[in-house]
Curated annotation (Swiss-Prot):
Catalysed reaction equations from the record: S-ubiquitinyl-[E2 ubiquitin-conjugating enzyme]-L-cysteine + [acceptor protein]-L-lysine = [E2 ubiquitin-conjugating enzyme]-L-cysteine + N(6)-ubiquitinyl-[acceptor protein]-L-lysine
Pfam entry (one): HECT
Species assigned in the record: Mus musculus (Mouse)
Lineage of the organism: Eukaryota, Metazoa, Chordata, Craniata, Vertebrata
Reported function: Probable E3 ubiquitin-protein ligase involved in either protein trafficking or in the distribution of cellular structures. Required for spermatozoon maturation and fertility, and for the removal of the cytoplasmic droplet of the spermatozoon. E3 ubiquitin-protein ligases accept ubiquitin from an E2 ubiquitin-conjugating enzyme in the form of a thioester and then directly transfer it to targeted substrates.
Disruption phenotype: Disruption causes defects in spermatozoon maturation and impaired fertility in males; females display normal fertility. Males produce litter sizes some 50% smaller, as well 50% of mature spermatozoa have reduced mobility.
Protein name: Probable E3 ubiquitin-protein ligase HERC4
Length: 1057
């Protein structure tokens, strides 16, 4: 051991020497053949811990700080600690803390401000005593200020006690001195790697390099850009990105070591202790310029001086106050910048000089500083080992984290037979959010040091692998312990406000734990976890949303699937029956799960769909709840102003309506919602008409009205007649049920007449003779023609017709691209829509975007124009201002494609589409429609072609003499299944009025076949109003085939049979 600095009280442990100051490093004979584990320096005393766990002290003992009454000039053993294996010590001005290998803390010395934590009334304690209030807590680090103390536990809890004159306890401005350890609750949840204390200021350092400081700040020693004391922990933002791995404090200054080996200093600089070649104070962290060419691996602070070790040269550098020789430079001069400590330093990787005895060279193991003294533990070159590196943490001094080594250790014990300390270790780890937040860090490229509002610093794949390795059927005791810790200790302690982004990580990782997906744990773990998540304050929730938004899709889907499973589980319980006494808690649970999904859905939408929207669909909803009833309840809640946008706790008394969370509905469920909404509106319109009619009996000025919207049309003038009626129709009348009458036909419209009306009028309106729409040969689709002589009234009519079709649950045949439905739902068409409408043009645009070279102008020869046909002639349109003069290049090609798409789908047809849009929404607007995705709305308007002919046969009903196994029915289905697809579709058109099936699928298409009189010479007859087929009792298969084909080939017109 080498010692230098103030020896006036014997604090260097050199024995009875004459000098009061030692100007350069001097060997201590006492430590020959002894290995030092730790050194603590007080203002006038020093404590040494040897490798065997024994403690020695020397120096001033006026306040009992040595823990014994022996000699003060040379180190003497503290016999009271003889039975303890001490691993670390820390010293205040005149008090000492010692930590043993069991995590227990012993204290002695001055206790004027409660800095010993013993809750006693004595001014001084001369013999070490155990701090009993910490005896049940496993402490891994201790630190001392002059009159206060800090401790870090294995569970990442920070405790403080002693003086709080300057706020150095971090407990708030109202807090007086504390005589027993107090938990700093404001830091809960953060994963810490170090605690440090200066004269009257304190620091904690997180695993990802964030620093929180509090206490005295007269000289800027907290690095917060001012000189105001802090009474609660404050984040030192300027160092967050610097990968800080170690921090130490002097009386009024601070030094921080980076992962790359740089040193930042700040605070009091009056003696040059900051190393910036000045005596100025620094209120912001500043890098020590003269050390920037070297990699520093150790840094230590004395009262007003700083030491740094550079392993490449083996040298120790010091700067600051030198009046007591503490710089080791051979003089008492102060140094304002790093200066080499005198000595024959030997680099661990170097070669020992041959001409000098190796005993004259020192190979530094570790440096220590404190008060006005400095020490260096060294070895001779022949015994030289690697020096300590403060950038690498000692696992024994760190908090619990879930890692490969720890899991292997736990799994190494046979199931059901691991010792109590292992159970305590598992419990401690999974009871602490701080420990979980320090687990699964992204260590590749030191990524976790970039933790912030946009990056979590977590390796999610590591989290998944380690959780699955830990939770195994072969080790049920581990799973049970983890589940119990999460349920009883971790989750109940979660709060809505969090001190830092690092305290949020477990919200990201815990869903990867298989225990969360176990339905047995839904109500005890998953739902309480969701409640804590939903109740987070706006700022931390926003950060969590940011982190979710950059997850890999499968990881994001995992969280979505988890809470979908929770919802289904709860709804199944609800269907079985919930006792009235449990309804309130059930409501709360269901609201929680749905609110979590709502947050995740919001994130998904903001990111442009991290996962497909249909991944949020809960297909079981239709089976588990009455959607119609749910919708009616939701409408009533809206009418009475019930707000479900706030937290879960207030929602327990409000019945859950799934309609509040419409993103879980699949297309079929949404269709049911829309139909329910339409039925409600129709009923309201009918009721209003009835009320008006009743009033008209007593008040002649009030006209009677029809409760239905009646369209009387002629087949030969179907468009003109419909326009005439609809033009005069009031908006409110569109909400009435639609009844269609064809002039000269006897059919009563029970649905079939209406079906054919829509079929015929759309065929007429879309006919090229009107020139309203352009047909695209490549895609066989139509789009609005930008050159039409028709006024906007016709487009308005088509919009109304489409709206009426949806409103009256009728499929219509529209050959529009998906872009139409996007625009109806206020979504922007994209290049994909151009590819659908104009495949060749779309491919060309994609080739332009994908072209890898820079010579786009020469290769494509494009400018911001589009060439359109105008009655046989071509016309060039500019896509942007001065488009003809703007060449398409690598930088603006995306803008060109966007402008092209915008022209085709928006600008060129704006007035026409606006008329269509207005007509459509006049009938079919509202909140429910906006729940649909564009492809779902398309399927609802035109139906789909997901044919399942066996399902059709299965759902068919029979009347009269027929049943499923009747000979005629058997040959009917044989014939039907042998028909080609086109004939089958014709049969659907013949029987139902449309060759497409409803969005709800074949199961919703109920056909009825009934027997009729007459002979086999009669044709089958359809009643499209009722999807009813009159089928004569054919006995021959071939006869049935011929008659059926003959019937379906002539299917237009209605008459009563």
């Amino acid at each position: 051991m080498l010692c230098w600095g103030n020896a006036s009280y014997g604090q260097l442990g050199l024995g009875g020497i004459d000098e009061e100051i030692v100007l350069e490093p001097r060997r201590s004979d006492f430590f020959v053949n002894k290995k030092v584990r730790d050194v603590g320096c007080g203002l006038r005393h020093t404590v040494f811990v040897l490798d065997d766990g024994t403690v020695y002290t020397c120096g001033c003992n006026d306040l009992g700080q040595l823990g014994h009454e022996k000699s003060r000039k040379k180190p003497e053993q503290v016999v009271a600690l003889d039975a303890q294996n001490i691993v670390a010590v820390a010293c205040g001005e005149a008090h000492t803390l010692a930590l043993n290998d069991k995590g227990q803390v012993y204290a002695w010395g001055l206790d004027s401000d409660g800095q010993l934590g013993l809750q006693g009334s004595e001014e001084c304690i001369r013999v070490p005593r155990n701090i009993k209030s910490l005896s049940d807590i496993q402490i891994v680090q201790v630190a001392c200020g002059y009159y206060h103390s800090l401790a870090l536990s294995k569970a990442s809890e920070v405790f403080c006690w002693g003086q709080n004159k300057y706020g150095q306890l971090g407990l708030g401005i109202d807090c007086q001195k504390q005589t027993s350890p107090q938990l700093i609750k404001s830091l809960l949840g953060i994963p810490f790697m170090q605690v440090a204390a200066g004269g009257a200021h304190s620091f904690v350092l997180t695993l990802s390099g964030a620093i929180f400081g509090w206490g005295r700040n007269k000289f800027g020693q907290l690095g917060l850009n001012d000189e105001n004391d802090r009474y609660v922990p404050n984040l030192l933002k300027s160092l967050r990105s610097q990968k800080i791995v170690y921090i130490c404090c002097g009386e009024d200054h601070t030094a921080a070591l980076t992962k790359e080996g740089g040193v930042f200093t700040f605070g009091a600089g009056g003696y040059g202790q900051l190393g910036h070649n000045s005596t100025s104070h620094e209120i912001n962290p500043r890098k020590v310029f003269e050390l920037m060419g070297s990699i520093v691996t150790q840094v230590a602070c004395g009262r007003q001086h700083t030491s740094a070790f550079v392993p490449s040269s083996g040298r120790i550098y010091s700067f600051g106050l030198g009046g007591n020789g503490q710089l080791g430079t051979g003089s008492t001069s102060n140094r304002k910048s790093p200066f080499t400590v005198k000595g024959n330093w030997f680099s661990y990787n170097g070669q020992c000089p041959q001409d000098i005895g190796s005993e004259d060279y020192f190979c530094v193991k570790r440096i220590f500083s404190g008060g006005d003294q400095s020490f260096s533990h060294y070895s001779s070159p022949q015994n030289c080992g690697p020096p300590d590196d403060f950038r690498c943490s000692d696992p024994s001094k760190q908090i619990w984290t879930v890692n490969e080594a720890l899991i292997q250790k736990w799994l190494s014990y046979p199931s059901g037979r691991f010792p109590v300390e292992i159970a305590n270790e598992i419990d401690g780890t999974f009871s602490s959010s701080g420990c979980l937040n320090g687990s699964f860090l992204a260590i590749s490229n030191d990524d976790h040091y970039r933790t912030g509002t946009r990056f979590s610093g977590v390796d999610m794949n590591a989290a998944r692998l380690l959780f699955h390795k830990l939770i195994q059927p072969d080790h049920p005791q581990i799973s049970q312990q983890v589940a119990a810790s999460l349920e009883k200790n971790l989750i109940p302690k979660l709060t809505s406000s969090l001190p830092d982004v690092e305290a949020l990580r477990f919200y990201l990782t815990l869903p990867e734990c298989p225990l969360m997906s176990d339905c047995n744990n839904f109500t005890t773990i998953a739902i309480p976890f969701g409640t804590a998540l939903v109740n987070l304050e706006k700022a931390p929730l926003k950060v969590l949303e940011n982190w979710w938004s950059v997850l890999e899709p499968p990881l994001f889907l995992k969280i979505v699937e988890l809470f979908k499973e929770v919802v289904v589980h709860l709804l199944k319980l609800y269907k079985i029956g919930i006792p009235p006494s449990e309804r309130r808690i059930f409501n709360s649970f269901l609201h929680t799960a749905l609110k979590v999904l709502e947050i995740l859905h919001r994130v998904n939408e903001k990111t442009g769909q991290l996962i497909q929207y249909d991944k949020f669909y809960i297909h079981e909803v239709q089976e588990l709840i009455d959607i119609r009833n749910d919708y009616i309840n939701w409408v009533q809640q809206q009418a009475y102003g019930v707000d479900v946008s706030h937290g879960v706790t207030e929602l327990a008394d409000i019945p859950v309506t799934i309609c509040t969370y419409p993103f879980v509905f699949d297309a079929q469920a949404k269709t049911t919602l829309l139909q329910t909404d339409a039925v409600l509106q129709m009923q309201m319109a009918i009721d209003q008409a009835h009320r008006q009619n009743v009033s008209s009996l007593f008040l002649p000025v009030i006209e009677s009205v029809n409760p239905c919207l009646i369209l009387v049309v002629r087949r030969e003038n179907i468009v003109g007649d419909a326009m005439e009626v609809l033009r005069k129709t009031k908006n409110i009348d569109y909400k009435k049920p639609l009844k269609v009458i064809f002039v000269g036909e006897d059919a009563v419209d029970a649905g079939g007449v209406r079906k054919e009306f829509f079929l015929l009028i759309m065929r007429e309106l879309l006919d090229p003779k009107y020139g309203m729409f352009r047909y695209y040969e490549d895609s066989r689709l139509i789009w609005f023609s930008d050159k039409t002589f028709e006024d906007s009234d016709l487009f308005h009519l088509i919009g109304v017709i489409c709206g009426l079709a949806i409103y009256n649950f009728t499929i219509v045949d529209l050959h529009f691209p998906l872009a139409l439905y996007k625009k109806l739902l206020k979504r922007k068409p994209s290049l994909d829509d151009l590819k659908e409408l104009m495949p060749a043009v779309g491919r060309s645009m994609q080739q332009l975007l994908d072209y890898p070279e820079d010579d786009i102008e020469e290769t494509f020869c494009l400018n911001f124009t589009i060439t359109v046909e105008n009655f046989g002639a071509t016309e060039v349109k500019e896509l942007v201002l001065n488009g003809a003069d703007t060449a398409v290049n690598r930088q603006n090609r995306q803008e060109f494609v966007d402008a092209y798409v915008d022209y085709i789908f928006n600008k060129s047809v704006a007035s026409l589409f606006d008329a269509f849009h207005a007509g459509f929404h006049k009938v079919c607007g509202g909140k429910v429609l906006l729940l649909f995705q564009p492809n779902e709305l398309q399927a609802m308007v035109i139906g789909n072609t997901n044919y399942d002919w066996k399902e059709l046969e299965k759902n068919t009903e029979y009347k009269g003499e027929y049943w499923a196994d009747h000979p005629t029915i058997k040959i009917f289905w044989e014939v039907f299944h042998e028909l080609p697809l086109e004939k089958k579709k014709q049969f659907l058109l013949f029987l139902t009025g449309s060759d497409r099936i409803p969005i709800l699928g074949m199961k919703s298409l109920k056909l009825v076949i009934q027997s009729t009189g007459g002979g086999e010479s009669y044709l089958p007859v359809s009643h499209t109003c009722f999807n009813l087929l009159d089928l004569p009792k054919y006995t021959e298969k071939e006869t049935l085939r011929c008659k059926l084909i003959q019937a379906i080939d002539h299917n237009e017109g209605f008459s009563l049979i």
